[in-house]
Amino acid sequence: MNKEAAMKIDRRNFLKQCALVAGASVLGRSALATDKSVKNSSTDFKADKPNIVLLYIDDWAWNGTPVAMDDAMDKSHMPILQMPNLEKLAREGMRFRNAYASPQCSPARVCVQTGQSNPRSGFTVYLGAKEPYYDTNKEYQKFPLVPNVSDRELDKDAVTIAEALKPLGYVSAHLGKWHMRGDPGNEGYVLHDGATDNNPGNTLKANLKPGEPTPKRLPKDMTDPKLMFSITEKAIGFMEEQVKEGNPFYLQISHYAMHEGRECLNKTREKYVNHPLVQAWYKKNNKDPETINRKDDPANWLAMGEDLDGRIGAVLDKIKELGIEDNTYVIVVADNGYRHEELELTPGLKQPLHARKWWLWDGGIRVPMIVKGSGIKPGSVFTGNVVNYDFLPTFYDWAGGDPEKLQNIDGISLADYMAGKEPDKTFLNRNLYFHYPHYRSSVPHSAIISGPFKVIHFYAEPDIPILVDLSKDLGEMSNIAKQNPETHRKLYDEMMDYLKEVGARYPKVNPDYDPEVYKMDKKTKERIQWGPFEGQRTLDDDEI
C-alpha cells in the first residue's frame, strides 16, 4: 500500500473511531439514567473537557522574551523587553528549556496541525510565490545542489487539530496567520481568517495603493499594529460564544508579530525611544529616532513585543472573567527560532545560540515555550526535549482522547509530563527529526536530536560529519564527531533510515554547478560562515 492510500484509510478510520469513542463515552455515563439525564450527560461530557488556547508567535527567538528559558544562562532572555503578562504566565505555568520547532514558518505550522514531522508531511519550506519551489528558480540553477520541491498545502487526508477534537465535542477557531494554503474551514475550523500569509499582518504595506511606496515611518494614527488588536477581539468573541453555548473549544491565535515589518503603537514606541539603552544605541550608531527607518529601529521591535504582551493579557483576562481559568490550557510558543539584535542593547549580553531562522542549528529551531493549565505546577521548568509536532497528541490527550490511536504521526503526548510525571530514558533519548533540503541564506541539510546529542548532515559537504553535545555546548561551538564516531554513526544512520522510511525528498548534485556563480551570490558568505566545520567553529561578532 502506498503512503497516500495509507493516509486516506487512516484518516477515514480515525475520524470514524473518534466519533464512536465520543458517543460511547456519553452513552457509558448515561446507561442507567432517565431520558432527562441522558440529555444532560451530553452537556456533562462537554463541560468537563478543558479549553485549549494556543498563542502562536511569529519569528521569536528562544531568548527573545523577558522570561529566562534557562535560569543558569543570562543570555536566555531579553531583560529590556517588558512583557508583564508573559512573565506572569511563566510564574503560573511551566517553561520548556528545550522546545524545538521547524526552521521556517509554513513547515512549522504544518507540524503543529498534523503532528507530523516535516520530512513525513513533505512540507519542508515556506509558501512563497515560486512554483514549484526553487527547482525552476534561476537564482539557484548554478548552485552545488538542485533543491527538491516541497508540498504546497496540507495533505487533504491529514488529520488536523480541529478535525481530531471535533468528535470529542470541540469547536475550533484559527485566527491570524495560516500560511499553509487551502481554507482552514476545510480543515475543521468554524471560525478563521482564510488562507492568510504574511501580507495581512504587514498592514502598512497591505493597504498601499498600486505604485505607492511602503512607509518608512510609523503613521501617527496606527491603532491595530500587526492586526494584533482585531485578532484578539475576534478571539475574545469566540470564547464568549462558546462559553455561552457550553462548548469546549480549541482556539489558535496565530499572531503576525513578531515577524519583520515592524509595527507598534506610537505611545509604546515612545517609551522605548526614551529608554537609556535605546538612546545609547541611537548615539552609537548615529541614528535619529525622528528619522530612522522603522525596519532599523530597535524601539519599534521592542514596542511591538510589549503591544503583543498586552493582547496576550487581554486573552488571559477574558479567560478569567469567563470563569474558565481553571479549565483552560494556555500555550505560548514561537513558530521558529530567530536572532534578535535587540538582545545586545543590554551590556554584556551576547547571542547564546548558533545561526538563526532557516538553519537547523539551534538558533533556527530552539523556541520559547510556556504552558499554563490544570495540573501544571506553577513556576516549573521541563528540561526534556519537546517539539512542535507534539501539540496534536497532547491536545487530543487533554480532550479525553487516546493519543495512541493517532496514526501516521511523529509526536507524542506531553500531558503526563506537564502533570508532573518524571520522563524516563525512552522519552529523554527519543529522536527528533528536522529536514530543510533547500537554499535560502542557508543550505540543504537535515538534523536529528537524541537526548543531549545532535547530528547535522550537510548534503553538499557529506564528508564533514557533525556531532554536538547540547548539554555541554548549547552554542554548538565544538564538533565532536571525530572523537565520538560511534555516536555519530548511530544517530546518522537512524536519521537517514527515518528519512527513507517516511519518503522524504532529497536534494541532488547539480551537474551545472558553477563555483564562481555560487561564490558571487550575496548570501553565500553566510552559507559558508554557518555551514559545516571541523573542530572549533569561529565565533560570530555578536557572540564574542
Task: Please place each PLM-identified region on the residue numbering.
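N-terminal export signals
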Residues: 2, 13-33
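Active-site-proximal cap/lid insertion segments
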Residues: 38-50, 57-80, 88, 101-104, ...
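His/Cys-centered metal/cofactor-coordination and adjacent catalytic loops
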Residues: 72-78, 119-161
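Active-site nucleophile/metal-coordination loop of metallo-enzymes that catalyze phosphate/sulfate
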Residues: 91, 100-125
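Residue-level detector of anion-binding/catalytic polar loops
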Residues: 95, 171, 318, 454
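Conserved S-adenosyl-L-methionine
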Residues: 95-100, 176
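Short active-site alpha-helical segment characteristic of glycosyltransferases
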Residues: 161, 177, 391, 414
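Short, surface-exposed beta-strand/loop micro-motifs that present aromatic residues
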Residues: 162, 444-449, 453-457
